[in-house]
């Protein structure tokens, strides 16, 4: 009999997709036929003449399942959507597509929407979907502060008996013992079991060079030879001597500055921890900079945005990046398998 697990979260960008990818790949490795589904998608992009849910496409591709897994996508402002759709029609679309996706599967992992409350107005919030699909629920809590415990308890009120298991994600090291002690006691009293606490990993919160190029709407002057991750951004509005100090202290840095700052760019290219250069204002550098960047394998991105706008765009996507590309998938799998009790999840689902 097919089993269903809905992975929900108390807030957006909690790491649901990464956990689903790691769990799905582990279950498949153990011999289970794994399906993937998402009822409501809000991060939509245009493919041809239709809107599709980008996050679910990426996750489905990594899991090696069919990619058309999200029957309801937000293709207009939410208030317009909520006042123009028929919840009965939406629920039927969800059930029909889930029936197709689940055929021949031992287990289907369902990804919740932005957070467990999203979709209440149209009747396909996570709790409603879990009830429709007779799913068990695994809740992900991003440990930004101690108040996440209150958020988890509020979610328990919404899900009721469907929710029994919790994973905390992106936990700072000093909070791990707190979770094992106080938080576990409080949640156990509410009928919740913490099955994992995944530590924060700066690489997972970082950006690939391609994600940086997309964020600043740039073009490559020097393309990356391999996938590199950027964890910090350094703004080059200073002398080369001052910048040197910041670049030395930065981890896997991207330098953002104008293409006319040849002295600064050449200094940055001497630093082994500089992962890419982002040149603003459509100012191309002198050939010496490009030649040296090519020699050292440092990608160079040119954008029409000014430095402030480029940095603002990067700040808006740091920590909200997707788990894609072999390096991130590998790290997420290792963290998941080291810090989450997979056996307990399997028993929770009733898988043989």
Swiss-Prot record:
InterPro entries linked: DRTGG, P-loop_NTPase, Phos_Acetyltrans/Butyryltrans, Ser_kin/Pase_Hpr-like_N_sf
Taxonomic path: Archaea, Methanobacteriati, Methanobacteriota, Archaeoglobi, Archaeoglobales
Signal peptide: none
Family according to the record: To Synechocystis PCC 6803 slr0039.
Pfam family for this entry, one: DRTGG
Domain of life of the source: Archaea
Protein name: Uncharacterized protein AF_1212
Species annotation: Archaeoglobus fulgidus (strain ATCC 49558 / DSM 4304 / JCM 9628 / NBRC 100126 / VC-16)
């Amino acid at each position: 009999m097919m089993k269903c697990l809905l992975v929900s979260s108390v807030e957006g960008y909690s790491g649901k997709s990464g956990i689903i990818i790691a769990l799905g790949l582990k279950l498949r490795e153990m011999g289970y036929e794994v399906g993937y589904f998402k009822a409501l998608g809000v991060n939509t992009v245009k493919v041809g003449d239709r809107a599709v849910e980008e996050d679910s496409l990426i996750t489905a591709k990594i899991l090696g399942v069919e990619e058309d897994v999200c029957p309801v996508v937000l293709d207009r402002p939410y208030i317009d959507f909520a006042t123009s759709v028929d919840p009965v029609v939406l629920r039927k679309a969800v059930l029909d597509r889930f029936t197709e996706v689940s055929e021949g599967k031992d287990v289907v992992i369902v990804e919740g929407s932005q957070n467990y409350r999203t979709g209440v107005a149209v009747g396909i919030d996570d709790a409603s979907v879990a009830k429709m699909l007779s799913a068990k629920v695994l809740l992900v809590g991003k440990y930004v502060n101690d108040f996440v415990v209150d958020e988890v308890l509020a979610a328990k009120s919404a899900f009721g008996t469907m929710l029994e298991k919790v994973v905390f994600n992106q936990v700072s090291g000093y909070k791990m013992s707190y979770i094992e002690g106080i938080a576990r006691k409080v949640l156990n009293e509410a009928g919740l079991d913490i099955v994992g606490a995944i530590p924060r990993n700066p690489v997972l919160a970082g950006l690939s060079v391609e994600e940086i190029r997309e964020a600043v709407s740039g073009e490559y002057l020097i393309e990356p030879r391999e996938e590199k991750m950027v964890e910090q951004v350094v703004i080059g509005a200073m002398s080369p001597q001052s910048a040197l100090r910041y670049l030395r202290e930065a981890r896997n840095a991207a330098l953002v500055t104008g293409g006319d700052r040849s002295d600064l760019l050449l200094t940055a290219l001497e630093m082994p921890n500089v992962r890419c250069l982002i040149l603003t204002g459509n100012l191309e550098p002198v050939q010496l900079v490009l030649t040296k960047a090519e020699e050292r394998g440092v990608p160079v991105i040119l954008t029409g945005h000014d430095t402030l706008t480029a940095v603002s765009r990067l700040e808006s996507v740091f920590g909200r990046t997707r788990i894609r590309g072999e390096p991130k998938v590998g790290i997420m799998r290792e963290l998941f398998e080291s810090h989450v009790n997979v056996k307990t999840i399997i028993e929770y689902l009733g898988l043989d």
